[in-house]
Swiss-Prot record:
This is DNA topoisomerase 3. Relaxes negatively supercoiled (SC) DNA in an ATP-independent manner at 75 degrees Celsius. From 50-85 degrees Celsius relaxes negatively SC DNA; at up to 100 degrees Celsius it unlinks catenated DNA to form circular double-stranded (ds)DNA molecules. The promotion or prevention of DNA linking/unlinking is temperature-dependent in vitro and probably depends on other factors in vivo. One study found single-stranded binding protein (SSB) does not enhance its activity, while another study found it does. Binds single-stranded (ss)DNA and less well to Holliday junction (HJ) or forked DNA. Its cofactor is Mg(2+). It comes from the Archaea. It comes from Saccharolobus solfataricus (strain ATCC 35092 / DSM 1617 / JCM 11322 / P2) (Sulfolobus solfataricus).
């Protein structure tokens, strides 16, 4: 008898094969393993002898496909394997679900409980099954208890999430396909050359932010400022104090220092403070990506992928969450009990010692209605490869740190007053009284200072000092992690999409890795410049952030999907009108960028000349440099050549500026 030959069952659709297996094993002690089209699926019976077939998808099985031409507004959902050759592997999953849907009594979407999971399951059931017979399973971890609870509490389809997801797909498709085709058509009509180019609703403002930042760095000229350091002899101590005052002119700093030398100082106040250093809340995805990047240098995209693997292995809760909270419905004690039976036993013993066995989660500010903060499930990890272990260890330690206790620090602060002079300054040292969570989540360091013992009324003398010159610094280059933080602060994308968007920009050769930093390529530079110049609305962060807010409102049922899509089409029409006016200029700019037509190059780089034999950036650098030299002269009293040498030798000086300075020095 073929046990896989069944009918009259309910079809449960999981997002991935690992998830399908976990669901089957949670719902039955002996699930029947079957294979068809080279894909595994499982059959189970419940206590009422109802049959269930658990089948995996492979993520999205459907994608949007529109007509050729420009502009395009309409698209239909088509099987991915038909419209994308790189997704041909999804055909066997499509065939399996299609064949199993024919004999199903009903359908259960058990894909990840987020916007994408809701859309994946909805489209599969709508196109291959019967959406009128569909239900939803919602869980935050692939543990037996979570899956059983979700199975017992099956609900109606989450249409607000589905509508928000479909709106996001349609809007991203509308902007991506039309802006990309506009760029390619402009180039093809002008230079008779077809080149694949792309732009998008979220990726374009992100690219422009990196490019604008890089331009400002290349144009940066450090300016001098001055501070004063003094050496104070008091009791047996020789204290090196940096006075908290800045001077624009060196003469002012020297005059200030001369007045201080040999002055008496007196301790006028001693303050002892004990403060708590609060333990951290559990991770949301962005926090995890930032910490993994800071500690291990792992890219946000890879952090997300590794976390998803750990989730599918049943080791952590669902990672694509914005929440920093763990609700009371989740048993902290059971999780800790599970970790006690793993390699984390010593750490659990330490947490128990710190808390006396009473565990209270440090709840964060951010929340997510769909999922709690990322936390270990309590299942013991076994033989994890190094990359997985690093992420799991971060999550486990962060969770245990969040249920331990705040650290306790003491700060001793001495206020010293200079006699016959309007200046007070402080000297302090920090001591750790109780480490608590710092011993659990040991990735956070607190520096203890060498103690200083002074009393009120103690006197000393300023015996020496010096004037320090410091140069202003440009903003730091973006790393993948800092760019992710900028995207979050600008409300661009979601916690589930930001890391992937950064990787897309690298894959399309708009950005490239430069050590731990990312910088624009020549192509990325030109694309950003063209979008900035001709289509500023597309790269306006406010427009994209506003759209993200509207999509969130769909998810909470506050606005209709159709209204948001209509609004985007109106904005797209405005873009198309602007494009028609600038089409030839866009084509010419792209042709120049790709080297398809000859240009008169800047004497310092490959960009087109703008004025005086210079591109517009080197010309701007020259103008800024002339102004900066005058500021240097006023502040330092240096001669012209010395100023140029100081600017040239500074690591902060931008590339465009250095090119101009080098030429000026060679001409003197």
């Amino acid at each position: 008898m073929n046990l896989c030959n069944v009918n009259n069952y309910y079809l449960i659709i999981a997002e991935k094969s690992k998830a399908a297996k976990k669901i089957a094993e949670a719902l039955s002690e002996k699930p029947i393993l079957c294979r068809k089209y080279n894909v595994s699926y499982w059959i189970i019976k419940d206590h009422n002898s109802s049959k269930y077939v658990i089948v995996p998808a492979a993520g999205h099985l459907f994608g949007l496909k529109g007509e050729s031409g420009f502009p395009v507004y309409d698209a239909d959902w088509k099987p991915l394997w038909e419209i994308d050759k790189n997704s041909y592997y999804t055909k066997r999953y499509y065939q399996l679900i299609s064949s199993l849907s024919k004999y199903a009594l009903g359908f259960i979407n058990a894909c990840d409980y987020d916007i994408e999971g809701s859309v994946i399951g909805y489209l599969i059931i709508k196109n291959l099954g019967d959406i009128k017979k569909a239900k939803r399973m919602k869980f935050s971890a692939l543990t037996k208890s979570d899956i059983l609870s979700a199975f017992r509490n099956i609900s109606a389809l989450d249409y607000d999430m589905i509508n928000a997801g479909i709106a996001r797909h349609k809007i991203d498709w509308l902007w991506g396909i039309n802006v990309s085709r506009a760029l390619m058509i402009s180039l093809q009509d002008f230079a008779k050359k077809r080149v694949i180019l792309s732009a998008g609703r979220v990726q374009s403002p992100t690219l422009v932010q990196v490019v604008n930042s890089e331009i400002e760095r290349n144009l940066f000229i450090p300016l001098p400022k001055f501070t004063v350091s003094i050496i104070v002899k008091i009791k047996d101590y020789s204290l090196n104090i940096k006075v908290n005052k800045e001077f624009e002119k060196i003469t002012e700093a020297k005059e200030f220092l001369n007045k201080l030398i040999n002055k008496t100082v007196k301790v006028v106040e001693v303050e002892n403070r004990v403060r708590l250093l609060e333990r951290p809340s559990p991770f949301n995805l962005t926090d995890l990506q930032i910490e993994a990047g800071r500690i291990y240098g792992i890219s946000p995209y890879n952090v997300e992928r590794i976390a998803e693997d750990l989730y599918l292995d049943g080791l952590i809760s669902y990672p694509r969450t914005n929440s920093q909270k763990i609700p009371s419905t989740i048993s902290i004690y059971n999780i800790i009990k599970g970790l006690e039976n793993s390699s984390y036993r010593k750490l659990v013993d330490l947490v128990r010692k710190i808390t006396g066995g009473k565990y209270v989660v440090k709840q964060g500010i951010k929340d997510d209605p769909a999922h709690p903060a990322i936390h270990p499930t309590g299942e013991a990890p076994k033989n994890l490869p190094n990359s997985k272990f690093k992420i799991y260890d971060l999550i486990a330690r962060r969770f245990l740190g969040s249920v331990s206790a705040d650290a306790k620090l003491s700060n001793t602060i001495y206020t010293l007053k200079v006699s016959d002079f309007p200046l007070e300054f402080t000297v302090s040292y920090t001591k750790i009284l109780e480490r608590n969570w710092l011993d659990i989540y040991h990735f956070h360091n607190v520096k203890e200072d060498k103690p200083i013992f002074l009393s009120k009324g103690d006197e000393g003398k300023i015996v020496d000092g010096k004037v320090n010159i410091s140069l202003s610094k440009p903003t730091s280059r973006y790393t993948k992690v800092s760019l992710l933080k900028w995207m979050e602060s600008s409300n661009l994308g979601t916690e589930a999409t930001r890391g992937r968007i950064i990787e897309i920009l690298v894959k399309r050769k708009y950005l490239t890795n430069n050590g731990r930093y990312i910088i624009p390529t020549k192509l990325g530079f030109y694309i950003a410049e063209i979008l900035n110049k001709f289509f500023p609305d597309i790269v306006d962060v406010r427009m994209t952030a506003d759209m993200e807010s509207k999509l969130e409102m769909i998810k909470t049922g506050k606005v209709l999907e159709s209204k948001v899509i209509k609004e985007n089409i109106e904005k797209l029409n405005k873009f198309i009108e602007e494009y028609k006016v600038n089409k030839d200029k866009v084509g010419e700019s792209l042709a120049k960028a790709l080297g398809l037509i000859k240009i008169v190059k800047c004497k310092y780089c490959d960009l087109e000349q703008y004025k005086d034999g210079l591109c517009k950036y080197h010309y701007e650098a020259k103008v800024r440099l002339l102004d900066a030299v005058e500021i240097w002269k006023e502040r330092t009293k240096y001669d012209h050549k010395k100023i140029l040498k100081r600017i040239s030798s500074s690591k902060s000086t931008g590339k465009y500026v250095k090119d101009i300075v080098t030429y000026m020095l060679s001409s003197e």
